A protein has these predicted regions:
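Gram-negative bacterial Sec-dependent N-terminal signal peptides
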Residues: 1-20
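Sequence/structural signature of beta-propeller domains
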Residues: 21-385
Length: 385
């Protein structure tokens, strides 16, 4: 039986300013039913008679209780891949199963055990999608060169998604986010894609989807949207994983990454700055967001992580207050993007970033994995990661 370790934290008491009590944690090994694997029939199939493990946990959503069982929705990312040598200036990746479709799954936690069940491939009217990088001529391209397991070059695919977060859409389906575009994707409960939103193309640009601010195209490659959550008022808040790299000049300097608000009913957007822990990192581009989850219409929980100046991983959960945060949309002008401003200049321009308070250090609770990518709120005192 294939297994993937996902620590599930319980008994983490939240008080919105500091922990009311010392948090505790329980860890579960998530198992998969016999036969649940990524099919692999490539050149080296004999070495993998049971296929490849399924990598869940790129997003996590608490969906309720069924008797004494806790249930969660989760999503995989773009599928099995491996680094390979650069081709000129371009990064390359080996996609051992290029036809892999990201999976929507359910996790059940009951009687001290956790199991991932009911895999549903993401698909559209043309059939199953895949996780391949986009073509090089569209917004959202990472300029990665994709290779097969035998190092044959693969074409970019504009139906490729690198899915990360998951949140309900209020209609029985879900919103997902993606690291490529970056994209917001609305799906039904069976994994069918209903709508996609991405950075709106400017003159002379080519886009797969629109409706989101054009500036988001400057996300660092493979660091697009990393987590999202639905607010009680129906807005979707989605986090850009790391600092934007505007004109390839701002990623190391920017003091914040962006939180994007999207109203599915009206299409209205807004953007807020989440202040990263700049002093902790060798460079600001090392900071990464892992996931977010809503507390109310103005407060979210957020995982900030990355290697610090001493090359040690840090995985922290913060409560983020958006009440006084400025909408950055009105400040985004060529040559005046806030990503290039220091604290003094931000203040002089009247730009206020979100406020934040540390809730818990996951490392202090025994978190061992490099990254935490799924965050779910079970109740007012309990989180799952």
């Amino acid at each position: 039986m294939k297994r993937k370790i996902i620590p599930v934290l319980i008994g983490c008491t939240l008080s919105f300013s500091a922990l009311a009590a010392q948090p505790t944690a329980e860890r579960y090994v998530v198992s998969f039913p016999e036969g649940t694997h990524v099919n692999y029939a490539g050149a080296f199939a004999s070495a993998f008679p049971n296929g490849l493990p399924v990598g869940i946990g790129s997003g996590l959503l608490f969906t309720g209780k069924q008797g004494d069982a806790l249930t969660f929705a989760t999503i995989t990312d773009r599928g099995p891949n491996a680094d390979s040598p650069k081709e000129g200036k371009n990064e390359t990746k080996i996609f051992v199963t290029p036809d892999f479709a990201p999976l929507l799954m359910t996790i059940r936690v009951q009687n001290g055990k956790a199991e991932a069940i009911d895999p549903r491939p993401l698909h559209d009217d043309k059939g199953a999608i895949n996780g391949l990088p986009l073509a090089s001529d569209v917004i959202g391209s990472t300029n990665e060169v994709a290779f097969s397991d035998t190092l044959h070059r693969l074409k970019g695919d504009n139906r490729g998604l690198d899915t990360e977060g998951i949140t309900p859409d209020g209609k029985g389906g879900y919103w997902l986010c993606d690291e490529y575009g970056p994209f917001l994707i609305n799906i039904d409960s069976k994994g069918k894609i209903l709508a996609i939103h991405g950075p709106q193309a400017a003159e002379g640009e080519k886009a797969i989807a629109g409706g989101l601010p054009n500036i988001l195209k400057w996300r660092q490659a493979n660091r697009g949207f990393e987590g999202l959550t639905r607010m009680p008022d129906g807005r979707i808040i989605v986090a850009v994983q790391s600092t934007l790299d505007i004109d390839a000049k701002s990623k190391k300097k920017a003091l914040f990454t962006r939180l994007v608000s999207f109203d599915p009913a009206s299409g209205k957007t807004a953007m807020y700055g989440y202040p990263i822990d700049s002093a902790a990192y060798s460079k600001n581009s090392d900071a990464k967001i892992g996931d977010i989850v809503a507390l109310d219409n103005q407060h979210i929980l957020l995982i900030e992580q990355g290697r610090d100046k001493n090359n040690r991983m840090r995985n922290l959960i913060y409560e983020v207050d958006l009440n006084k945060a400025s909408d950055l949309s009105g400040f985004d002008k060529p040559g005046e993007y806030p990503e290039f401003d220091d604290e003094k200049t931000l203040s002089q321009r009247g730009i206020t970033l979100a406020q934040k308070t540390q809730v818990v250090d996951l490392r202090s609770l025994g978190w061992q994995q490099e990254k935490a990518e799924g965050l779910a709120l079970i109740d007012s005192k309990t989180l799952a990661v």
